[in-house]
Structures are given as structure tokens and as C-alpha cells.
A protein has these predicted regions:
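A conserved catalytic-loop motif detector
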Residues: 32-39
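Short, gly/Ser/Thr-rich active-site loops of penicillin-recognizing serine hydrolases
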Residues: 21-29, 122-172
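Active-site beta-strand/loop architecture of penicillin-binding DD-peptidases
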Residues: 1-31, 47-137
């Protein structure tokens, strides 16, 4: 989604350096289009709503930057009893959302007490991504985004507004 719909096989090693300091980049990784660029752009806008004040991870927002993300909360299976016991909380996000440069994933296994991905992973993401953006000299975004409707009530209201605008255009 952050790469305009092209999935690139992940790697941990960007390249190697020999004893003389000569750098050799890793082999080119396979890339495959998995969604259209248009769909990826729409998904990025939706994912920005996740870090909005009404989203599930407002604690991941970084002042001055457009940030997008996805929260996750999953129950963990306990092999000893074959039942669910504990949680995995996660948040994965990227910034700047309008021109993605960095992606960070935070996964917390078996947290105690609070277990929601946005509440636990969001602050960690914010701290790490803020450091990355500042240390890499990424200028603040300077643009804003209209939030995507997050509830059925908001979706219905937006649909009615769009229909009213369309009706006005037809009568003009």
C-alpha cells in the first residue's frame, strides 16, 4: 500500500561491505503488483484516519507529518490447553503518508493489562518514527487530509451529502 500497490520481497540486509570498505548491494528483490496504484492511494487515505483523533491509534500521530497505519489485536492460542490465553497487539504504519519513505511495525506479544494494538503499539511507533524522520531530515509534510468516515452513521451522512451535491449539479 505504501509502495503504490507493488509488493517487494522484504530483506533485512541491504548489502555487505568487505574489509576494504567496498560495498556490494544485495541482489534485486522480486516485486509484484498486488493492487492498482489508485486502490493503494485510496487505502493510504483510509489508513490516515486510523491515526486521527477518532481513529483506533491517535497516539501514533506525529505533529507536522501525515501518518498512516493499521492496528491489530489478536487472541493467542495456548497449545497446552488448546484454548485462547493472552493477546498479540500490533501497529504497523508509514510516513509521510502522502510520500511514504519509512514503514515501522510494532508487535507486542502477551501484553499484561491493556491489549489493544493502537493503544500499545501506537506510542512506540510514534517515538521510533519521529526519530527516523528527524534523523533522516524528512521535512514536515505541511499538508492535511480530510478524514475518511469511520462509522456507519458518518458513511450515511457523507453519502447523503454527495447525493445532494449531485442533485444540485443536475439542476444547474
Amino acid at each position: 500500500i505504501a509502495n503504490d500497490g507493488v509488493r517487494v520481497s522484504p530483506t533485512v540486509i541491504a548489502g555487505t561491505s568487505d574489509a576494504s570498505g567496498n560495498y556490494t548491494p544485495s541482489a534485486t528483490r522480486e516485486s509484484v503488483r498486488v493492487v492498482s496504484a489508485e486502490t493503494a492511494q485510496k487505502m493510504r487515505l483510509m489508513m490516515e484516519s486510523v491515526v486521527s483523533a477518532n481513529g483506533t491509534a491517535p497516539t501514533a500521530a506525529i505533529a507536522g507529518y501525515r501518518v498512516a497505519g493499521k492496528t491489530g489485536t489478536a487472541m493467542r492460542i495456548d497449545d497446552t490447553c488448546g484454548c485462547y490465553r493472552g493477546y498479540t497487539a500490533s501497529f504497523i504504519g508509514f510516513a509521510p503518508a502522502d510520500k511514504p519513505a519509512y514503514v515501522i511495525s510494532v508487535t507486542i506479544q502477551d501484553p499484561k493489562g491493556l491489549h489493544w494494538g493502537g493503544a500499545l503499539g501506537g506510542p512506540v511507533f510514534k517515538k521510533v518514527m519521529s526519530f527516523v524522520l528527524q534523523s533522516k531530515g524528512i521535512a514536515p509534510t505541511g499538508t492535511t487530509v480530510d478524514p475518511v468516515a469511520l462509522t456507519e452513521k458518518q458513511l450515511i451522512a457523507e453519502r447523503k451529502l454527495a447525493e445532494q451535491k449531485a442533485a444540485r449539479v443536475k439542476t444547474n
